[in-house]
Amino acid sequence: MNERITILSAYSFVNIIEPANLIPKLLLVGKKKYIRGTILLANEGFNSSFSGSYENVNIVLKQLIALTGSKDVNVKINYSPVHPFQKLKVRLKREIIAMNVKDLNVDVFKGHYIEPKDWDEFITKQNVILIDTRNEYEIDIGTFKSAINPRTETFKQFPAWVQQNHALLQGKKIAMFCTGGIRCEKSTSLLKSIGYNEVYHLKGGILQYLEDTHNKNNLWQGKCFVFDDRRAVADDLYPAEGYWLHR
């Protein structure tokens, strides 16, 4: 029986002085350990998702942490019967998640985390407005019940949606969610930076929520879009039937 493939996703907002210098080192260790996936590097940190054996993905993660000097890394692991990536790519970017807002400091302006176990209770309270920060093609296959769909095609359009919807947001407790948490680090930071105080986000995103709660209250409806060949995962975090991208 073949060993199942481990998929490790990790991100960290950490100041990297010369991120380009890390590319050959990460490619070397990644290829040596038969890793596939994508690692994005920028001055603001790293964002990655890669697959391989459980031992090898953790070796690459340790190297990534050591090279970047990160002290606070958000990590998620799930599994697949086969690799969901075709090859290893390490890329230099201006942002690890592109929103095109200059000088946004996610360490200074940070939303309040809501643990997955507390999420259902929180989002069903009065005066809480729930926003899906993902793109419309992701929301089309699954989202939380009663979540607002900003109808964006890219995350870069989200700041404009916020500017156009101050009347909707004013005076509310704002709860936001995304796939794995990284987009909400920036979306909550954006709202905090322009004066909203009661800004919250789902810690670890939809994937952590499904892992921790098993969607016991059925507030999550549909599948969760993912950016690899699986295209979508079900409540058990295994590839959703009928979505796999065959190359």
Swiss-Prot record:
GO terms for molecular function: oxidoreductase activity, acting on paired donors, with incorporation or reduction of molecular oxygen. InterPro entries: Rhodanese-like_dom (IPR001763), Rhodanese-like_dom_sf (IPR036873), TrhO (IPR020936), TRHO_N (IPR040503). GO terms for biological process: tRNA modification. It comes from the Bacteria. It catalyses: uridine(34) in tRNA + AH2 + O2 = 5-hydroxyuridine(34) in tRNA + A + H2O. NCBIfam families: PRK01415.1. PANTHER family: RHODANESE-LIKE DOMAIN-CONTAINING PROTEIN 7-RELATED, THIOSULFATE SULFURTRANSFERASE/RHODANESE-LIKE DOMAIN-CONTAINING PROTEIN 2. This is tRNA uridine(34) hydroxylase. It comes from Rickettsia prowazekii (strain Madrid E).
